[in-house]
């Protein structure tokens, strides 16, 4: 095969799309507590905006509770406000330098909304994978047109790119199915 085409670059980009999907799904609230639920929250601290995990330690002491241990006493109020204003519907209770957050039960309607959002994230991931495939196919066509690779090499590499795309999309579908199961579990 030709050195002019690097399928590993496409693999890295597709893995990036899968990781982005995992990150997006991590922010969706399921019936269980998860430290990743608070990852998107940012805090105004020390004259800049920073992620919550840079000013506090997040743990899961119980299946329906999060514990946020703030490292600097002066930041407790800012962390509490940020969690309250995050739009996640969470209400932290302050206990010294620790915030305790009990996660309320999700009702059926909210579960269905979260599943829809998960499917939207999955579609965005599939679109990203298809864009990577399109870039790879365009690159192959150009290499073939410029006589850098033969038609046979182009066909074989095209099949590899398609298989990589199919495998990536199948992996994304599995990830979303697991997340959907977590969301719908009562």
UniProtKB/Swiss-Prot annotation:
CDD domains: RRF. One of its GO terms (biological process) is cytoplasmic translational termination. Keywords: Cytoplasm, Protein biosynthesis. InterPro entries: Ribosome_recyc_fac (IPR002661), Ribosome_recyc_fac_dom (IPR023584), RRF_sf (IPR036191). Pfam families: RRF. GO terms for molecular function: ribosomal large subunit binding. GO terms for cellular component: cytosol. It is found in: Cytoplasm. Coiled coil: none annotated. Transmembrane segments: none annotated. Belongs to the RRF family. Responsible for the release of ribosomes from messenger RNA at the termination of protein biosynthesis. May increase the efficiency of translation by recycling ribosomes from one round of translation to another. This is Ribosome-recycling factor. It comes from Brucella melitensis biotype 2 (strain ATCC 23457). The gene is frr.
């Amino acid at each position: 095969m030709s050195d002019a085409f690097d399928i590993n670059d496409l693999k890295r980009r597709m893995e990036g799309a899968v990781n982005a999907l995992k990150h997006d799904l991590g922010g969706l609230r399921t019936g269980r507590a998860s430290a990743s639920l608070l990852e998107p929250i940012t805090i105004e601290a020390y004259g800049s905006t920073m992620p919550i995990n840079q000013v506090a330690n997040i743990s899961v002491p119980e299946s329906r509770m999060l514990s946020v241990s703030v490292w600097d006493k002066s930041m407790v109020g800012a962390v509490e406000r940020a969690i309250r204003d995050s739009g996640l519907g969470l209400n932290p209770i302050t206990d010294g330098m620790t915030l305790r957050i009990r996660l309320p039960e999700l009702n059926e309607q909210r579960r269905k909304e979260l599943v829809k959002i998960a499917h939207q994230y999955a579609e965005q991931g599939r679109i990203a994978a298809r864009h990577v495939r399109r870039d790879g196919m365009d690159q192959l066509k150009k290499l073939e047109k410029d006589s850098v690779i033969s038609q046979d090499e182009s066909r074989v590499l095209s099949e590899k790119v398609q298989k990589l795309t199919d495998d990536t999309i199948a992996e994304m579908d599995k990830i979303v199915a697991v997340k959907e199961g977590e969301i719908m579990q009562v």
